[in-house]
């Protein structure tokens, strides 16, 4: 049984979050949680929170055994970018893009 958890509008770029997502794809959830705990990236905390939510969803909604779960799919899509202005010299301004992403984790007992 597949169970899904999502974090939409996560305040990290999709490119940076994908580096972390690639580390745990296909792993058992216990091993994936250990990897995320010791990964020194901001995105690892965000991905770990979504993974824990997916595990809780599988346990509560589907009655799945946590020991049998593995990360079936994990993907990170781009969310909308917030445009901000940074003042520069001589009255100019640069545009800053504050990027967001949508993190999706699918756990399965197969």
From Swiss-Prot:
One GO CC annotation: cytosolic large ribosomal subunit
Keyword Mitochondrion: no
InterPro entries: Ribosomal_uL22, Ribosomal_uL22_bac/chlpt-type, Ribosomal_uL22_bac/org-type, Ribosomal_uL22_CS, Ribosomal_uL22_sf
CDD domains attached to this UniProt entry: Ribosomal_L22 (cd00336)
UniProt keywords, alphabetically: Ribonucleoprotein, Ribosomal protein, RNA-binding, rRNA-binding
Gene3D superfamilies for the chain: Ribosomal protein L22/L17 (3.90.470.10)
Biological process (GO), any one: translation
KW Repeat (keyword) present: no
GO molecular function, one term: rRNA binding
Assembly with partners or alone: Part of the 50S ribosomal subunit.
Function: This protein binds specifically to 23S rRNA; its binding is stimulated by other ribosomal proteins, e.g. L4, L17, and L20. It is important during the early stages of 50S assembly. It makes multiple contacts with different domains of the 23S rRNA in the assembled 50S subunit and ribosome.
Family per similarity comment: Belongs to the universal ribosomal protein uL22 family.
PANTHER family: CHLOROPLAST 50S RIBOSOMAL PROTEIN L22-RELATED, LARGE RIBOSOMAL SUBUNIT PROTEIN UL22M
UniProt xrefs under HAMAP family: Ribosomal_uL22_B (MF_01331_B)
Protein name as it appears in the record: Large ribosomal subunit protein uL22
Native organism taxonomy: Bacteria, Pseudomonadati, Pseudomonadota, Gammaproteobacteria, Pasteurellales
